[in-house]
Amino acid sequence: MHVIVATDGSKQSLDAAKRLKSFADPSKITAISVVAVIRPLAAVAFADDLSGGQKTPADRDTSGFRAAAESAMATIAKEFDGWGPKVHQRLRSGSPANEIIKTARQLDAGLVVVAAGGRGISETVLMGSTAQRVQHYAPCPVLVVRPKPRKKKS
């Protein structure tokens, strides 16, 4: 089975990859494709929660988006080092939900893993909208990993 693990560069997407590892049998997975999607003419930069690097003005252009996406994919791919299945990194451009779904179809994926509530223009209004669209239209089962509950202030 080919598994797609989508990342938007958020810590939630890393948590989703770790969740897959926590229950899946690596001998049943033939390959993992880590997919990042950059949006053309994006108003919001690709998340960079995983690299820990400092942002510079140059990082805000499209090459910065690409570098952040590649860094996020590398971080997720590293999570699967030595686990078993071969890992591929696939950078796409377009609508995140559409590109994730298209990749799942092209690769005949058996599972798509996405985080709910990653990054977006408004995290409160669009919380999980990519995950919802992927869940609704993907050609295979979808594992949606919700963020850890926030601690309530006393």
Regions found by a protein language model. Name each.
Residues 77-112, 150-154:
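Structural beta-alpha unit
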Residues 36, 115-117, 146-147:
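Short secondary-structure boundary segments
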Residues 111-137, 151-154:
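Glycine-rich, Arg-bearing micro-motifs that act as flexible, cationic patches
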Residues 1-55:
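Small/aliphatic-rich secondary-structure junction motif
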Residues 33-35, 88-92, 143:
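General small-molecule cofactor/ligand-binding pocket signal
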Residues 16, 44-47, 101-102, 124-126, ...:
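Short, well-ordered secondary-structure micro-motifs
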Residues 22, 105-106, 136:
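Solvent-exposed polar/charged
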Residues 54-71:
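A short acidic, glycine-rich active-site loop
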